[in-house]
Amino acid sequence: MENLGFLIISTFLLLFTTLLPYSSASTTRRFHFNVEWKKVTRLCHTKQLLTVNGQYPGPTVAVHEGDIVEIKVTNRIAHNTTIHWHGLRQYRTGWADGPAYITQCPIRSKQSYTYRFKVEDQRGTLLWHAHHSWQRASVYGAFIIYPRQPYPFSGSHIQSEIPIILGEWWNDDVDNVEKAMMKTGAGAKVSDAYTLNGLPGPLYPCSTKDTFTATVDAGKTYILRIINAALNNELFVAVANHTLTVVEVDAVYTKPVHTKAIMIAPGQTTTLLLRADQLSGGEFLIAATPYVTSVFPFNNSTTVGFIRYTGKTKPENSVNTRRRRRLTAMSTVVALPNMLDTKFATKFSDSIKSLGSAKYPCKVPTKIDKRVITTISLNLQDCPLNQTCDGYAGKRFFASMNNISFVRPPISILESYYKKQSKGVFSLDFPEKPPNRFDFTGVDPVSENMNTEFGTKLFEVEFGSRLEIVFQGTSFLNIENHPLHVHGHNFFVVGRGFGNFDPEKDPKRYNLVDPPERNTFAVPTGGWAAIRINADNPGVWFIHCHLEQHTSWGLAMGFIVKDGPLPSQTLLPPPHDLPQC
């Protein structure tokens, strides 16, 4: 199975050479995804795994900035499915965004749907994944946008690129894991392994052969495209004996940041430069381990792979030499932070700044038209009568924003909005501030009432509005780092802090010069984060925690951007093959 690691790398090398790293030309690129079962073995455990085209991870979508993309998805399983193109803005094409019951009804068994959209003013590393129940545990892949212009990275010529997709593996059927969690009201069973490009590596049982390996030449520079497709865990990543240079996050160029390790949340991407500055013939660990802020059970293991330097070995000793090199690499200390190292996670996140050059300006709104402040909370709900619940104190776990636990409707919100048939589907009364003001991060999690309301509540803004959303963490049950993803828009993280947000003092300390531009960000443990959005994309857009367990519990909301005054500022009509509920 080690050959699978080389297969993934060679596929990317082929893309790197057939799709030039930059091009001013654009075209229509077509792909076909078959969602299907595939028998896969990991950790000495064989099971039917949900895949795209039988691949785990799924196929890479590689396009150029300005391309029109058509991806036909055929559902070959008995369950409904959808695919989300994570981080793609979908300007005026919300029908192609993918979250089930938000922008489309799911694709039914034996049916197909073609996602059509244009890649406009975006370049870099993104991802795609399933967006129905917990299918994205194995249905995911890289989405690479090559730029019109040369990379702005200074320094050495780029030799090639290496994709590294982080994931999780369960020996159990993940659908059953989710169902058990929702039935019992308890937390989900943790994964059995973390993976690098679908491979757990030699620290897990029966997995020496299932180890990711990338080959480099000494003296050359490589692009590492790091994608966190894990279901429920933020991760630290490092390469032994190497300094990494961050040059892009979430497909947006950044000022260079030199670091020994990174923290990356589910849904985030980080593009790094790795200079192969070690001696030929060596091997070095690349490792990922969780960043933990939760009191809930978690997988505390580490996945590793290898960066192998080319170099001649004597034929008669090649196997033994390779084994000795690998043992030496395994004994090398990797500069991974401690799993509880919030200080490092905070410092790293704060170090990321937008490039802010003349060619790639930072278009952060310096003034706002609307501010929404929302709490993000884990909740406990009373157990229904005649039912046993396994959550804390015999209750059920839920989650909420401003004490509203999001409920998906039985039909698409976008379609009902477009047809002006919202009655009974959703309402536009999401509270724009917490219903009660209290010490959000100092509350006693035992004595407080942690019940929540349920609903499909959104808020609405005018086209072109300059929107600020402040996400306030709470200490209900646990203070925790929440990675939140905004669909349909990039945003600027203008402020972050610990404790409670102060609307008078904290905005005075905002970074309105070069804040990081992202599509997914982490609200600090026991703190808050403020983002600003240029709301210039008409449609219905989902905001949710990218820890899938929390989304299932209701940690989500949505907002609507109304049509603008010009034809080019209006939502396009639905496609003819849009799935029906």
UniProtKB/Swiss-Prot annotation:
Xref: InterPro entries: Cu-oxidase-like_N, Cu-oxidase_2nd, Cu-oxidase_C, Cu-oxidase_fam, Cu_oxidase_CS, Cu_oxidase_Cu_BS, Cupredoxin, CuRO_1_LCC
Main localization (coarse): secreted
Record-given protein name: Laccase-1
GO cellular component: apoplast; Casparian strip
Annotated EC: 1.10.3.2
Required cofactor(s): Cu cation
Family: Belongs to the multicopper oxidase family.
Tissue expression remark: Expressed in roots, stems and flowers.
Cofactor binding, note field: Binds 4 Cu cations per monomer.
Plastocyanin-like domain segment(s): 34-150, 161-312, 429-565
Signal peptide range: 1-25
Record's function text: Lignin degradation and detoxification of lignin-derived products.
Organism in which the protein naturally occurs: Arabidopsis thaliana (Mouse-ear cress)
Binding site for Cu cation 1: 84, 485
Pfam families: Cu-oxidase (PF00394), Cu-oxidase_2 (PF07731), Cu-oxidase_3 (PF07732)
PROSITE patterns: MULTICOPPER_OXIDASE1, MULTICOPPER_OXIDASE2
Keyword Signal belongs to the record: yes
